[in-house]
């Protein structure tokens, strides 16, 4: 017999936009959220799940992710990409934007075609091009030989190849063509992100005024904050038009830097990301990031040549746990950084990012230690809680 279209999740602490409801009840009608309330009587013809001792939070939204489960979004087959998506879904990421790394333009336009198909099918929420329009001075784990200036014609070529699936382009806006490309992206409804940049404070302000709205992994791959030359960090933190990405894995950021970002930008302007590469959810070993060899040791990815950090092996549930248990952030702020803020940035907050009636039934069940115990996506269990369910 088919499972009932209606599910009732009871007894958990449910994190809503208005606050946390203890001993809450969340009703799932098919693929959508039906409603929420303190636990009350029986719903007829519903599958009931007693989640006492758990949290229910919105599904996580990852703006910046290069792969996982041993698979790369830049170079893998369709099956590889689906493996990476499935790996992150099992860790609570119900909405994912696939990020590419620097490559030849011909390669990236072809890649855009493959990833756009998966976007059209609903497996991905879109494409983020990180490179090749970045600064050689702040290239990080990108091949310097393949970098190029952000000429608008090249940026437009990637957008055209994406068939509407491009969601974000990271670029060093101080390079020739940078500001014009920011304006092009803004005109076409694609997020212009400042990253891998050697820009000054003043140049970054110009980029924001031209339409840039995201800081790609703030603090990383950009000049440090200085008292005479504040650089891009100060400009990005102070402007209310900008959302700042943070990689909260304990490697990319000192806790004081994360605290500074939340204090200066505020909880509504922070988006936790993974910047994950193939090893996320898979393990240590040798990998490729684009054309560059990477060695992952104790969960930290570094280029074999030069030793630069090469993305992360983070999953967003780990970012949640660290934020709660190490950084001591309130759960409501963490949920905004993992779900509501990136959903709003993508223009998808009418469907995802919070637990409200009519929105997609995307949610994560966490235990008291914030370990994932269940993942629901569009009303179907990706990971079913190990508790008794009674129809």
Protein language model features and the residues they cover:
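Active-site core of metal-dependent hydrolases
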Residues: 156, 160-284
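Divalent-metal coordination cores built from histidine and acidic residues
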Residues: 85-165
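Charged helix-capping and loop-helix junction motifs
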Residues: 77-80, 111-114, 151-153, 228-233
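Conserved, mostly hydrophobic/aromatic
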Residues: 129, 185, 215, 323, ...
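Metal-associated gating/positioning segment near the N- to mid-region
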Residues: 51-107
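C-terminal cap of metal-dependent C-N hydrolases
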Residues: 12, 344, 354-391
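His/Asp/Glu-enriched, well-ordered alpha-helical/loop segment
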Residues: 234-244, 262-274, 280-366
């Amino acid at each position: 017999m088919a499972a009932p279209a209606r599910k009732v999740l009871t007894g958990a602490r449910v994190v809503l936009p208005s606050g946390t409801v203890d001993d809450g009840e969340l009703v799932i009608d098919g693929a959508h959220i039906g409603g929420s309330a303190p636990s009350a009587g029986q719903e007829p013809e519903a599958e009931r799940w007693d989640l006492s001792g758990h949290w229910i939070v919105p599904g996580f939204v990852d703006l910046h992710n290069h792969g996982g489960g041993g698979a790369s979004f830049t170079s893998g087959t369709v099956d590889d990409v689906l493996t990476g998506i499935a790996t992150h879904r099992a860790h609570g990421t119900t909405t994912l934007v696939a990020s590419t790394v620097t490559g030849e333009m011909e390669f990236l336009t072809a890649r855009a075609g493959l990833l756009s198909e998966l976007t059209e099918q609903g497996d991905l929420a879109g494409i983020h091009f990180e490179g090749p329009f970045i600064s050689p001075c702040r290239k990080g784990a990108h091949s310097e030989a393949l970098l190029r200036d952000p000429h608008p014609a090249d940026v437009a070529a990637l957008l055209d190849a994406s068939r509407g699936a491009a969601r974000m382009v990271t670029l060093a806006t101080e390079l020739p063509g940078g500001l014009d490309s920011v304006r092009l992206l803004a005109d076409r409804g694609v997020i212009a992100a400042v990253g891998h940049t050697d820009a000054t404070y003043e140049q970054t302000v110009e980029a924001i005024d031209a339409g840039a709205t995201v800081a790609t992994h703030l603090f990383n791959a950009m000049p440090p904050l200085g008292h005479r030359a504040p650089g891009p960090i100060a400009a990005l933190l102070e402007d209310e038009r900008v959302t700042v990405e943070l990689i909260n894995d304990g490697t990319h950021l000192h806790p004081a830097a994360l605290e500074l970002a939340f204090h200066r930008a505020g909880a509504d302007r922070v988006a936790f990301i993974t910047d994950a590469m193939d090893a996320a959810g898979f393990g240590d070993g040798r990998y490729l990031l684009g054309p560059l060899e990477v060695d992952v040791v104790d969960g930290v990815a570094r280029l074999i040549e030069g030793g630069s950090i090469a993305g992360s092996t983070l999953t967003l549930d780990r970012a949640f746990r660290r934020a709660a248990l190490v950084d001591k952030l309130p759960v409501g702020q963490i949920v905004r950084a993992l779900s509501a803020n990136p959903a709003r940035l993508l223009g998808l907050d009418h469907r995802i990012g919070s637990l409200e009636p009519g929105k997609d039934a995307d949610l994560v069940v966490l235990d008291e230690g914030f370990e994932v115990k269940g993942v629901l996506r569009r009303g179907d269990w990706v990971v079913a809680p190990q508790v008794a369910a009674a129809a």
